[in-house]
């Protein structure tokens, strides 16, 4: 189980790296799906299946809509692939920044290779998922308001970008 959780963590980091290097929106969607599935699987292994399911539905549902808009706007006849030198350079630069930041910040010294799962506590482990909805609405009200405001702002930004030059502030002279 530990190796599987570490594999999910590696897939999460590689999926995030694939989204961050962003050679083309076509390939960014693949990285987004890999990172989302791996992250939700990681949360599932920690015992928070309700949070994992909610994040999976909301994140993939919302972000794939944004990627569909960006794919429809960026109609490249020859999109850049992950094998291009520029994209490989971006990926290597991101990995280098992560490694240097970990060494300088001292995170490498405190990292222990063990992963604690939900079943490691024996019979008396309390699963965090039993109070999932109650915790969302009691302790997470402020975060819900911030996330809702951010999603509303993102919706208006995407709608403004998709609208184009029809009635926007940028006009032809």
Swiss-Prot record:
Core subunit of the mitochondrial membrane respiratory chain NADH dehydrogenase (Complex I) that is believed to belong to the minimal assembly required for catalysis. Complex I functions in the transfer of electrons from NADH to the respiratory chain. The immediate electron acceptor for the enzyme is believed to be ubiquinone. Belongs to the complex I subunit 6 family. It catalyses: a ubiquinone + NADH + 5 H(+)(in) = a ubiquinol + NAD(+) + 4 H(+)(out). It is a multi-pass membrane protein. This is NADH-ubiquinone oxidoreductase chain 6. The chain crosses the membrane at residues 1-21, 27-47, 48-68, 87-107, 139-159. It is found in: Mitochondrion membrane. The keyword Plastid does not apply. It comes from Larus canus. InterPro entries: ComplexI_Subunit6, NADH_UbQ/plastoQ_OxRdtase_su6, Nuo/plastoQ_OxRdtase_6_NuoJ. GO terms for molecular function: NADH dehydrogenase (ubiquinone) activity. It holds the Pfam family Oxidored_q3. It comes from the Eukaryota. GO terms for cellular component: mitochondrial membrane. Its EC number is 7.1.1.2. Keywords: Electron transport, Membrane, Mitochondrion, NAD, Respiratory chain, Translocase, Transmembrane, Transmembrane helix, Transport, Ubiquinone.
């Amino acid at each position: 189980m530990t190796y599987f959780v570490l594999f999910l963590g590696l897939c999460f980091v590689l999926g995030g790296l694939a989204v961050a290097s962003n050679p083309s929106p076509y390939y960014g969607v693949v990285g987004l799906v890999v990172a989302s599935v791996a992250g939700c699987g990681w949360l599932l292994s920690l015992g928070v299946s309700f949070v994992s399911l909610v994040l999976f539905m909301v994140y993939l549902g919302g972000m794939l809509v944004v990627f569909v808009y960006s794919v429809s706007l960026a109609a490249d006849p020859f999109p850049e692939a992950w094998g291009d030198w520029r994209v490989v350079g971006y990926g290597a630069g991101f990995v280098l920044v992560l490694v240097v930041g970990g060494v300088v910040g001292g995170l490498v010294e405190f990292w222990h290779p063990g992963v604690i799962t939900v079943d490691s506590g024996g019979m008396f482990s309390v699963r965090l998922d039993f109070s999932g909805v109650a915790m969302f609405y009691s302790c997470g009200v402020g975060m819900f308001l911030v996330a809702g405001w951010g999603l509303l702002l993102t919706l208006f930004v995407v709608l403004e970008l998709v609208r184009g030059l029809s009635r926007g502030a940028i006009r032809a002279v």
